[in-house]
Amino acid sequence: LLKLFSGRQFSEFFTYPGLEKIQNRNSVCISVKVEHNVGSSMYDVCSMEYWESAIEYITRTVENPLFFICSDNVEYVLRNLIDATKYDYVVQDKNVPVYVSLAVMSECKHFIIGNTTFGWWAQYMSQNPNKIVVAPSKWMAVDMPIDLYENNWHLIEV
């Protein structure tokens, strides 16, 4: 499955803005779904404190990170989560198909994911054996067994 979905099969992959930076730096994909299931408290897990803790952990652990911001609301992320004066970043190109963005996300070295499958798939598709994945300790606000976590992930209590 991973070989079938390599980004290299899509022409848009090679011209994706910031791809070279993402491939050659300590890139960290931060996948934030701002409008995540609006009206459903079951998925209301990742607070502002979660994102702040996740970013702080990455900046302590990864030297000179380049954040690749993937979100349904990039402006919100830049205004509230990533200090654009302090960190280098690249933003998701909304003019290319989402499957190309997913392939580019998987090129990142490390990942901060929320409780969405989009970020989960990006880290899963990553070929970096030394990747750091930061995730919320719960996937849903209700107690329900979820088998999505890897043993080596850094979980932040939510």
Spans of features found by a protein language model:
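Compositionally biased, low-structure terminal segments
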Residues: S6, S11-T15, F68, G119, ...
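Short aromatic-enriched loop/helix-cap "lid" or pocket-rim segments at secondary-structure transitions
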Residues: M42, L81, P145-D147
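Short amphipathic alpha-helical segments, especially helix-boundary/capping motifs
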Residues: E52-A54, N95-V98, N152-W153
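Donor-binding and catalytic core of enzymes assembling or modifying cell-surface/extracellular glycoconjugates
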Residues: T61-D143
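Leloir-type glycosyltransferase catalytic cores
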Residues: A141-V158
